[in-house]
Amino acid sequence: MTQANTVLKAWDKTLETKDFTHLEKYLSRDFQFEDTTGELDNLENTKSWCVAGGLRINNFKTIPENENYIVATHDVIQEGSPKSNVLVYAEQTNGKFTYWKIQRAFEA
């Protein structure tokens, strides 16, 4: 089982360094990322925006987690955008995340 805090720290390290290897080891080959609008990205598209820069995440809070899923929140700091908070629901199998869904809310 991969804990929420572990994968979120790896995700931020990827955003900071633009090096996807920090995060890639936690994601399955058939990984899907679903954004707030319901748009789905595969592993390659997720890699593209992760290594593009201009985005950081912090203030990780785990709600529940177990060997099958995590639910957590984190803040987002993105160049040119107001501060925002994200709710994450993610599913994992054998320590690799297969699905990651976010709901993002911006400060007014």
Task: Report the location of each language-model feature.
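Generic helix N-cap/helix-start motif at coil->alpha-helix transitions
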Residues: 2-4
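Amphipathic alpha-helical repeat scaffolds
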Residues: 8-13
